[in-house]
C-alpha cells in the first residue's frame, strides 16, 4: 500500500540491510585501513630509528647548537593593527582627544 520512500516498511527494510548486509562491508574496510595504518606507522618508526643510528651523536650536538643560536625576537601583539577599520578608529580617537577651543568673551 505505501509506496513512498518514507514509508515505515521501507525504512525498516533499509535499516535491516544497513545493520546486516552493509555493516559487514564497512567493518571489513575499517579493519583493512587500520591494519595498513599500523604497518605504515611501524615502517616510519623503523626508518626513523635507522636514520638516528646512522647520524649518531652528530644529531644531538646539532640540536643543542640550534637551540642556543636562535633566541627569537619577541613579537608584540599589543597596539594598533594595520587593518583599515583600526586606522579609522585610531584617527577618530585622535580627533576626539584634541581639545576643542571654546568661544571666549571679550
Swiss-Prot record:
A Pfam family per the record: YBL028C_N
Biased composition (Basic residues): 83-106
Residue ranges with Polar residues bias: 1-12
Region (Disordered): 1-21, 52-106
GO cellular component: nucleolus; nucleus; preribosome, large subunit precursor
Ranges of biased composition (kind: Basic and acidic residues): 62-72
Domain of life of the source: Eukaryota
InterPro entries given in the database record: DUF2423 (IPR019434)
Signal peptide location: none
Protein family according to the UniProt entry: Belongs to the UPF0642 family.
Leftover remarks: Present with 6210 molecules/cell in log phase SD medium.
Name by which UniProt lists this protein: UPF0642 protein YBL028C
Organism from which the protein derives: Saccharomyces cerevisiae (strain ATCC 204508 / S288c) (Baker's yeast)
Amino acid at each position: 500500500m505505501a509506496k513512498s520512500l518514507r514509508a515505515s516498511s521501507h525504512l525498516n527494510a533499509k535499516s535491516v540491510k544497513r545493520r546486516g548486509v552493509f555493516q559487514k562491508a564497512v567493518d571489513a574496510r575499517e579493519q583493512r585501513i587500520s591494519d595498513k595504518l599500523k604497518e605504515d606507522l611501524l615502517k616510519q618508526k623503523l626508518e626513523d630509528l635507522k636514520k638516528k643510528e646512522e647520524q649518531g651523536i652528530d644529531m644531538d650536538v646539532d640540536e643543542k647548537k640550534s637551540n642556543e643560536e636562535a633566541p627569537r625576537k619577541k613579537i608584540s601583539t599589543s597596539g594598533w593593527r594595520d587593518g583599515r577599520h583600526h586606522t579609522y578608529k585610531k584617527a577618530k580617537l585622535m580627533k576626539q582627544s584634541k581639545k576643542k577651543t571654546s568661544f571666549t568673551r571679550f
